[in-house]
Design a protein with these regions (language model features):
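Electrostatic, structured charged patches in enzyme active sites and in nucleic-acid/phosphate-binding
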Residues: 1-122
Length: 122
């Protein structure tokens, strides 16, 4: 379901997310966003989410994966920027910061299992 033959190198959490997303029947395609080359959210910082997902219903989801060691102000700023983008982009667009299961996510973020549950319904 990737848009391209080969995607850029991914870390373990990104790869896990992509494998789970690919298995969902309501996912039309996904794309690995190349930092500093592809899409970014422009705001008080430039934020390059990891993955763009399109559902069969046409919703666009941006997902940023984070390990527990990255619970910091930079991640909080990205959550705020992603939420602002989703509000401005309209009802067909969503943004999620996704932490691996077993980690307590930052406010405004979700775990991998929670994200996949939400994605199944979009």
């Amino acid at each position: 379901k990737s848009l391209y033959q080969a995607e850029a190198n991914m870390d373990t959490l990104e790869r896990e997310l992509v494998m789970d997303v690919t298995a969902l029947p309501n996912v039309r395609w996904w794309h690995r966003i190349m930092e500093r080359h592809d899409f970014y959210i422009n705001g008080f910082i430039n934020h390059y989410p990891d993955i763009m997902i399109c559902t069969q219903s046409g919703k666009i989801i941006l997902a940023e994966t984070k390990g527990g060691h990255l619970k910091n102000d930079d991640s909080r700023q990205k959550i705020a920027l992603g939420a602002a983008w989703a509000r401005a982009a309209g009802t067909q667009c969503r943004y999620f910061m996704v932490f691996k299961d077993g980690e307590t996510p930052l406010d405004g973020a979700v775990t991998m299992s929670r994200f996949l549950g939400i994605l199944r319904e979009l």
